[in-house]
């Protein structure tokens, strides 16, 4: 590494020390090195893929801004890990065409081979694969709907990767709704609407993410309507993703609701525990990590909301183990993760019914006074879940369970809360109950 690269790296680190907290700097930058600095391109090497991903998601723009401030002009930034993963992060733009680059947003890790299929995403996966193989035939548009971190973006980009592998010259455009809007604003400002329209309306496959953010943007909706029509009439494939159904997006034009719903709307739900474990196992395999089964079970049981949260927990655990030098055990990672139980909007009737079903008891058993161990245990779990996932007071929960005193409710909640931290079987039971309650509550 020449002296100019060393000097730039030194200056960059000194600036980052001033901008970041000490723990953040030491955790994410202290082990990084500069690998290359030439032809206005800076390549930074992270210690492992987890740090690489964190830098990409959280410090990309900061690095680019600081480097530009140091050298006086925009610089291309690349991140790499010691294992060889490379992600092109930041490329300076000088014209509208460069800002409208069609494929540089695709994450190389978002492909079909790395997507874990389970019962909650099987239809969406099958539809995405069909679209990738024969775009513009069936399911046009394909509308992927689901909560945050459930794999919509992964599937969209997998379509792009698959098509580009078969036909490298395909014009595959992946953009967020925000980027589409920003490109539109730039085109208006630069008086280059013709260039904007030529770009988007000549796509072979248009992948638009986070469509819910089109809400309230009348001019963006107008321009997107005509873009959609042009592509659809030409037999080109459009794939859309949103955290809600078309008709649930506020102030979305009726004509757009109609067009977005004319193909296939594929819903993606939170993964079940078996799928969550498979996701963790596959990620560990790709990252060359050896994870004990009990660690995988612990994370899968305690993180149930979405895949992003699940993988985030794995990253925190492995980063902590890497830094601390401790063995990978549940006991060592539990204090770092400290997973919260996700609160849900539900009713006491649903909780009572789910608990009774799980333990093969009747509602009368739960509300009665039997001290049989299995009934008492189920009753305590029911009280705990009702306390955690409803707004009922302690006396009101006691009434739901046949008029029990509020001190009995307190004892039950405390006992389950303490026991779950040492009992992995109880953790799994609670996770299964919450999944079932979630499912029934969504269908109320």
Curated annotation (Swiss-Prot):
Region annotation (Domain IV, binds dsDNA) ranges: 322-444
Any single biological process term in GO: DNA replication initiation
Signal peptide, first to last residue: none
Residues covered by region (Domain III, AAA+ region): 105-321
One GO cellular component, as annotated: plasma membrane
Keywords assigned by UniProt, alphabetized: ATP-binding, Cytoplasm, DNA replication, DNA-binding, Lipid-binding, Nucleotide-binding
Name under which the protein is recorded: Chromosomal replication initiator protein DnaA
Organism: Microcystis aeruginosa (strain NIES-843 / IAM M-2473)
Gene: dnaA
């Amino acid at each position: 590494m020449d002296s100019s690269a060393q000097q730039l790296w030194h200056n960059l680190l000194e600036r980052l020390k001033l901008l970041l907290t000490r723990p953040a700097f030491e955790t994410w930058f202290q082990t990084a090195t500069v690998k290359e600095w030439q032809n206005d391109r800076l390549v930074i090497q992270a210690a492992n893929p987890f740090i690489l991903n964190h830098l990409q998601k959280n410090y990309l723009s900061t690095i680019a801004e600081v480097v530009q401030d140091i050298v006086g002009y925009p610089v291309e930034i690349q991140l790499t890990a010691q294992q060889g993963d490379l992600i092109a992060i930041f490329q300076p733009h000088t014209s509208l065409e460069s800002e409208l680059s069609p494929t540089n947003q695709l994450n190389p890790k978002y492909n079909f081979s790395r997507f874990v299929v389970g019962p909650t995403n099987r239809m969406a996966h099958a539809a995405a694969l069909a679209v990738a193989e024969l775009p513009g035939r069936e399911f046009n548009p394909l509308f992927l709907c689901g909560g945050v971190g459930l794999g919509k973006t992964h599937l969209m980009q997998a379509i792009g990767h698959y098509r580009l592998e078969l036909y490298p010259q395909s014009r595959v455009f992946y953009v967020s709704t925000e980027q589409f809007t920003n490109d539109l604003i730039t085109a208006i400002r630069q008086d280059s609407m013709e260039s904007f329209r030529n770009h988007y309306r000549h796509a072979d496959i248009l992948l638009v993410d986070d469509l819910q953010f089109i809400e309230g943007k009348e001019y963006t909706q107008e321009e997107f309507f005509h873009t959609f029509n042009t592509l659809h009439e030409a037999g080109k494939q459009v794939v859309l993703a949103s955290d809600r159904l078309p008709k649930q997006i506020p102030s979305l034009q009726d004509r757009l609701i109609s067009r977005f719903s004319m193909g296939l709307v594929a819903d993606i739900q939170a993964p079940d525990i078996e799928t969550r474990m498979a996701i963790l196992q596959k990620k560990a395999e790709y990252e060359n990590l050896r994870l004990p089964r009990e660690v995988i079970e612990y994370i899968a049981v305690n993180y149930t909301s979405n895949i992003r949260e699940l993988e985030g927990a794995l990253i925190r655990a492995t980063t902590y183990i890497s830094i601390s030098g401790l063995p990978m055990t549940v006991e060592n990672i539990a204090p770092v993760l400290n997973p919260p139980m996700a609160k849900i909007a539900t009713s006491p009737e649903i909780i009572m019914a789910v608990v009774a079903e799980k333990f093969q008891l009747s509602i009368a058993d739960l509300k009665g006074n039997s001290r049989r161990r299995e009934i008492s245990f189920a009753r305590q779990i029911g009280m705990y879940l009702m306390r955690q996932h409803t707004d009922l007071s302690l006396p009101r929960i006691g009434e739901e369970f046949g008029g029990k005193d509020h001190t009995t409710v307190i004892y039950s909640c405390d006992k389950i809360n303490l026991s779950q931290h040492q009992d992995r079987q109880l953790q799994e039971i609670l996770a299964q109950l919450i999944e079932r309650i979630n499912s029934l509550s969504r269908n109320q």
